[in-house]
């Protein structure tokens, strides 16, 4: 029953929706300065007293006067390593608090220095090989740089012996991937869909066209069917220009130049050409690919003459 009564007394009576979240200037002006002036008589319902050297950071939320918050406030006294020194003992049983960054100056009305804020991070283990954690502490103290009094002095403790500490656990800061909406479509597909909708609204019917390549059996059938002029026109040989009847072919072999006349019947030619007049065209008839016996004999004679001359010459130069 006594523990429940103490728990009720520890909880401040705040209206729903209110949170204890003072600014840096408010912490120095309304909570730290009065505590330094009257350390025994001044007490705040939202801030308790704790010895940070005897508590681990994960145990501090249970010792706070305000539960259910993401940050916790405490009054603490500095434990100096040496009576006449400025260094503070920040070690606990499981680790130590290490200062990081530069101290921040706290001003009143943007021109009067009233306090300092130091940021510390808790490390597990012993320095300098401790493991960094996400526990962070902001230590607020008054702006007083006077040296500490000697141990035998009867003067009151210094102003910076007391501090307000704000403890919180920093999140890891891992960003979650942004999910892609299932209704999103690429820009090209969206544009094509808009074009189809526009054509449908205008009454235009789009019929897909499919081109088919002729199969091998169709090509063989066209070769066999010589009676169809259109089919033969697809397989017609290319047109070659025939040489004139008296076109000489001269071979220089030293002092005995020789020439012979080419036979126009040696070259393929078509009997008729395509007529493009009148906006149309006429498919030419298939040309004959058969060589007469007389032409074949002339070709053999010419080939024999060329072979005999090529064997006897040392350096032949062909002139057309």
Swiss-Prot record:
UniProt domain NAC: residue ranges: 14-170
Q: Which domain of life is it from?
A: Eukaryota
The molecular function terms of the Gene Ontology recorded here are: DNA binding; protein homodimerization activity
Annotated tissue distribution: Expressed in developing seeds. Expressed in developing endosperm.
InterPro entries, per the entry: NAC-dom, NAC_dom_sf
Enumerate the subcellular locations listed in this protein's record, separating them with semicolons: Nucleus; Endoplasmic reticulum
A cellular-component GO term for this protein? nucleus
> What does the UniProt entry report for the null mutant?
No visible phenotype under normal growth conditions. The double mutant nac20 and nac26 exhibit a floury grain phenotype due to decreased starch and storage protein content.
Main location per the UniProt record: nucleus
Q: Which UniProt keywords apply?
A: DNA-binding, Endoplasmic reticulum, Nucleus, Transcription, Transcription regulation
Q: Which residues bind DNA?
A: 114-176
Q: Which GO terms describe its biological process?
A: positive regulation of DNA-templated transcription; regulation of endosperm development
State its role: Transcription factor that acts redundantly with NAC26 to regulate the expression of genes involved in the biosynthesis of starch and storage proteins in grain. Directly binds to the promoters of starch synthase 1 (SS1), pullulanase (PUL), glutelin A1 (GLUA1), glutelins B4 and B5 (GLUB4 and GLUB5), alpha-globulin and 16 kDa prolamin, and activates their expression.
Q: How does it assemble?
A: Forms homodimers. Forms heterodimers with NAC26.
Query: Domain remarks in the entry?
Result: The NAC domain includes a DNA binding domain and a dimerization domain.
Query: How is this protein named in the record?
Result: NAC domain-containing protein 20
Q: Which organism is it from?
A: Oryza sativa subsp. japonica (Rice)
């Amino acid at each position: 029953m006594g523990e429940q009564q103490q728990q009720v007394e520890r909880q401040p009576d705040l209206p729903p929706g209110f949170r204890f979240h003072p600014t840096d200037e408010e912490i120095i002006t309304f909570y730290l300065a009065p505590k330094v002036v009257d350390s025994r008589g001044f007490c705040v319902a939202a801030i308790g007293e704790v010895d940070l050297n005897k508590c681990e950071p994960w145990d501090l939320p249970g010792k706070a006067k305000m539960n259910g918050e993401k940050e916790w406030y405490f009054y603490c006294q500095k434990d100096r390593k040496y009576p006449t020194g400025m260094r503070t003992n920040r070690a606990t049983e499981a680790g130590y608090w290490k200062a990081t960054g530069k101290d921040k100056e706290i001003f009143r009305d943007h021109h009067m220095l009233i306090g300092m804020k130091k940021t510390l991070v808790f490390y597990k283990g012993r320095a300098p090989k401790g493991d960094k954690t996400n526990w962070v502490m902001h230590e607020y103290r008054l702006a007083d740089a006077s040296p500490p009094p000697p141990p035998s002095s009867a003067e009151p403790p210094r102003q910076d012996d007391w501090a307000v500490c704000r403890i919180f656990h920093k999140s890891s800061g891992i960003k979650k991937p942004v999910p892609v909406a299932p209704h999103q479509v690429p820009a090209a597909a969206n544009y094509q869909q808009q074009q189809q909708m526009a054509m449908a609204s205008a009454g235009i019917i789009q019929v897909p066209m499919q081109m088919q390549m002729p199969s091998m059996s169709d090509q063989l059938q066209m070769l066999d069917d010589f009676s169809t002029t259109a089919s033969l026109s697809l397989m017609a040989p290319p047109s070659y220009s025939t040489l004139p009847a008296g076109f000489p072919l001269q071979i220089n072999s030293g002092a005995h130049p020789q020439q012979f006349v080419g036979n126009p019947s040696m070259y393929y030619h078509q009997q008729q050409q395509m007529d493009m007049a009148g906006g149309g065209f006429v498919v030419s008839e298939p040309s004959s690919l058969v060589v007469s016996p007389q032409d074949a004999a002339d070709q053999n004679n010419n080939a024999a003459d060329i072979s005999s001359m090529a064997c006897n010459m040392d350096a032949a130069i062909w002139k057309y």
